C-alpha cells in the first residue's frame, strides 16, 4: 500500500510536517509494509515559507529590510537549493501585523523589493511569493522602487511613498535592473480575484481594514486609477481588471505589469512546488487535514486541493482534523471520502492543542483508521 500524506498545519499545535509525520507513525503502526510519503502543505498564506523550508530541507535567510512605515524590520525568505527558488511572504516585510499604525497613505512595500533584491544578489532566479496580510495600498510602487524603477511627478521628481504617491505619478523610468529582473520567474500565491480599481478593487474592499477612512477611499482609488493608466502607457499592458490585480493593495498588479508575474491560487502553487502530483500517480490512499474541518474547507482550502488531486488518480482521500463542524459534511462532496476528528475524550482546548498531545492523538487516530484498510 502506498500512502501520500499532505496535511496543513494545526495552528498553535503542529506544523505541517509534524502533523504529517504523526500520521505516518500511526499508519506504520497498523501497516508495517506501507510506503508512506509525507509532503508539506500550505495554502500560500501565513506559514507557507516555514512549511516549505522544513518540508523541502530549505535554508532560512534573514534580512533586515525597510518596514511598511520606513522602520527597519527583520524579514526572511526560504532558499530551496535544488530548484534555486526563494519562497517568501510579503507580510514579513510589509505586513499589517508589523506595526500598530494603520496609515495606508504612507505605508510602503519597499521592503518587499529589498527582500527580492537580496535573493537575486545570491543568484536566485525563481520566486514563490505569498502576498496576503499586507499593510499597504501603494500599488506595489514601493517594491518596484526598491527594484530600480523610478516613479516621477510633473516636476520630474520622485513622487514619494505610499498611497499618497499614486495620484502624483506622471511618468515611470524603467529599472536599470530590468535585464536582470527579466531572468526571474515570479509565481505569486494569490487567492483573491479583485481588480485593481473600483468598488470591488483593492482600495474599497481591503482598504478599510488597513485604515482607509470613508473620505479617503475615493481619493486613493482615483490615485490607483492614475497609476494604472500611466503604467499601461509604459508597459503596453492593461491589467487593472485582471483577477488578482487588487491583491495586497495592488501588489498583484505590479507583479503582472512590471515583472511578468503569474498569479496562481495558493494551494495549486504549493502542490506544484512540493511535487505532490508525481507521488499520487500510483498512490492507494491520500491523507490530508487541518486544524478545523468546516464549510470553508469545502470551498477550496488546502485539504480539498489535495483531495481533488487524489481523485484525479483514483486514490481514496482521508482527512484528519482537530475539530469537525456539522457543515464539514460538504467536504465529502468536495472530494474527501471520509474525515475524522483526532481528539480522544473530553478535554479543554488548551489540552487538545498541546503539541505532544496533538501528535499522539493524530498518530493514534491514523493507526485505528488504517487498521481497516
Task: Give the predicted meaning of each segment.
Residues 1-131, 135-373:
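N-terminal loops that bind phosphate or other acidic moieties
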Amino acid at each position: 500500500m502506498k500512502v501520500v500524506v499532505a496535511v496543513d498545519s494545526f495552528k498553535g499545535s503542529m506544523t505541517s510536517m509534524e502533523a504529517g509525520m504523526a500520521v505516518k507513525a500511526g499508519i506504520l503502526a497498523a501497516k508495517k509494509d506501507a510506503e508512506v510519503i509525507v509532503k508539506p502543505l500550505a495554502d500560500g498564506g501565513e506559514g507557507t515559507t516555514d512549511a516549505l523550508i522544513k518540508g523541502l530541507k530549505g535554508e532560512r535567510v534573514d534580512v533586515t529590510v525597510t518596514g511598511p512605515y520606513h522602520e527597519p524590520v527583520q524579514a526572511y525568505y526560504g532558499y530551496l537549493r535544488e530548484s534555486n527558488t526563494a519562497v517568501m511572504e510579503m507580510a514579513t516585510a510589509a505586513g499589517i501585523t508589523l506595526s500598530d499604525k494603520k496609515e495606508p497613505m504612507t505605508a510602503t512595500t519597499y521592503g518587499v523589493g529589498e527582500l527580492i533584491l537580496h535573493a537575486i544578489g545570491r543568484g536566485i532566479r525563481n520566486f514563490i511569493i505569498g502576498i496576503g496580510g499586507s499593510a499597504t495600498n501603494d500599488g506595489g510602487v514601493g517594491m518596484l522602487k526598491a527594484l530600480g524603477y523610478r516613479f516621477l511627478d510633473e516636476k520630474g521628481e520622485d513622487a514619494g511613498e505610499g498611497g499618497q504617491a499614486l495620484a502624483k505619478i506622471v511618468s515611470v523610468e524603467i529599472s536599470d535592473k530590468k535585464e536582470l529582473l527579466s531572468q526571474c520567474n515570479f509565481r505569486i500565491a494569490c487567492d483573491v480575484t479583485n481588480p485593481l480599481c473600483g468598488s470591488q478593487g483593492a482600495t474599497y474592499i481591503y482598504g478599510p481594514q488597513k485604515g482607509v477612512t470613508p473620505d479617503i477611499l475615493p481619493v486613493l482609488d482615483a490615485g490607483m486609477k492614475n497609476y494604472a493608466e500611466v503604467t499601461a502607457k509604459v508597459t503596453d499592458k492593461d491589467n487593472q481588471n485582471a483577477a488578482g490585480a487588487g491583491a495586497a493593495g495592488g501588489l498583484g498588479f505590479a507583479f503582472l505589469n512590471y515583472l511578468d508575474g503569474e498569479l496562481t491560487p495558493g494551494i495549486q502553487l504549493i502542490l506544484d512546488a512540493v511535487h505532490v502530483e508525481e507521488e499520487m500517480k500510483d498512490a492507494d490512499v491520500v491523507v490530508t487535514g487541518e486544524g478545523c474541518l468546516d464549510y470553508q474547507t469545502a470551498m477550496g482550502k488546502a485539504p480539498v486541493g489535495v483531495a481533488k488531486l487524489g481523485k484525479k488518480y483514483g486514490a481514496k482521500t482521508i482527512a484528519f482534523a482537530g475539530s469537525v463542524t456539522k457543515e464539514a459534511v460538504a467536504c465529502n462532496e468536495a472530494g474527501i471520502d471520509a474525515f475524522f476528528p483526532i481528539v480522544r475524550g473530553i478535554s479543554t482546548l488548551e489540552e487538545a492543542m498541546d503539541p505532544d498531545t496533538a501528535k499522539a492523538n493524530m498518530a493514534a487516530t491514523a493507526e485505528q483508521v488504517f487498521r481497516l484498510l
